[in-house]
Amino acid sequence: NGAVAATALAARGAKVALVDKGDFAGFTSQNSSNLVWGGIKYMETFEFPLVRQLCMSRNHLLRSYPSSIKEIRFFTNLEKGFRFPPFMLYCGALLYWAIGNFFTRPPRFLIPRQINNVESVINTEHSIGGFEYSDAFLYDNDARFVFNFIRSAISYNCTAVNYIESLGSVRNEQGEWKTQLSNTKNGETFEVRSSVIINACGPYVDQQNQVSNQTTEHRHVYSKGIHLVVPQITNNERVLTFFADDGRLFFAIPMGGRTMVGTTDTRVSSPETEVTEEDRQFVLDNINKRLNLDKPLSETDIISERCGVRPLVIKSGEKNNTNEEWMKLSRKHAVDVDCEKKHISIFGGKLTDCLNVGEEICEAVQQLGIHLPDEKRKWYGEPPEAIRNEYLNQVDLMGLDKLTSSGASEVLSTRLWRRYGAQAIGLLENIREDPEMAKPLIEGTDYIRCELTQAARREMIVTLEDFLRRRSKL
């Protein structure tokens, strides 16, 4: 939310400062499933306007970021005793496709034999059929996608800093906000002044508002979700979709040479969470029941874990005590605007809807009297076609793709453009000067040496985790 808000406002002429207590995308975003989807699960609760909005947002992202966001098939197996018959869910998938303006490939009905023929790794012993439909995913990861927004914001003269914590904001008699900031690495404190405050602290929006004595119409409740990264389950580029023992959607998501399995949905009271033994066992039990593996997955197969919270939006006075009320909560976002104090809070939301959040914040800021001189300027999307053509021309002239290592998952030209956009042209110059810069940094990975130099110079890395976990896919 903060990254798109900063990019949209800076691109349209506002003077913007973006402050992050940790690293950019270092909390909820880095723990996401990397899926860009239209909310098919909300079909069951008849939230068709939300599904329509999310489908349109998904389509918009697919058009705007063709290198970074790709359509992917979701392959769904249903078992005996499921609450709906397969053909009914297939009809729902057809409706989902129609709600999304038929933008993706059409759904397909599957009988157990077809499921077994296409994905023999799926246990079809209790299968009653299934279906296949399309949504989208981030080819790299959520954290990298967010950082590319940060990079765009900086190119529009936004001041963006990580590892700087807000200690709270107060508004003086002249109507100006004063925010105390602290460097979390050396303890240095300083003050910044602004006409408007935008609280885009994700799961910590409520806590930040308390520090600044700000009351709002909405608040957050939290759902913990975990994913386990395990050795590759299938080399087919599709998401395997099941319904877990608790009835929720459950995925096995391709992740390069690995597979990410999850997720859980556990009500928690704080954004600070961790993976428990119960979480691990739930995921392992569910995936092992639904796959035909030579050897069941165990804790020794876990390469890494992801654990984060979904900030769910409710009215400030609501309780949502029952499980039924809890399960009906969606990932809709809300923007609270305090016109008197010139304060904005962004609650909830998901990656799929990020461009809408940026547009809504621009409208809200104008509502507060801030002039945006370039209010119609497009602030998102990949670089113009002319820049891409120049990049590809240089790629051809230097024979870049011939330098791609034998174990790479894609050619260098595709990878560098997706990750760096127009800045990839500078990487070509580095490789021309020294072809060794096109060699893998670590054998078995796609990351090449010139990218390390790029990261050190231009990607605001403070800790090794920033590089390993969020800027690269190592």
State each model region's role.
Residues 185-196:
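Core beta-strand elements of the Rossmann-like FAD/NAD(P) dinucleotide-binding domain
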Residues 34-118:
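Dinucleotide-binding Rossmann-like beta1-alpha1 core, especially the glycine-rich loop
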Residues 162-177:
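A conserved short coil-to-beta-strand element within the FAD-binding core of flavoproteins
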Residues 107, 127, 142-148, 152, ...:
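C-terminal catalytic lobe of FAD-dependent flavoproteins
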Residues 1-2:
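Hydrophobic/small residue at the entry helix of a nucleotide-binding pocket
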Residues 6, 10-11, 152:
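Gly/Ala-rich phosphate-binding loop of Rossmann-like dinucleotide-binding domains
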Residues 194-206, 233, 265, 351:
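Glycine-/small-residue-rich beta->alpha transition segments that form the dinucleotide
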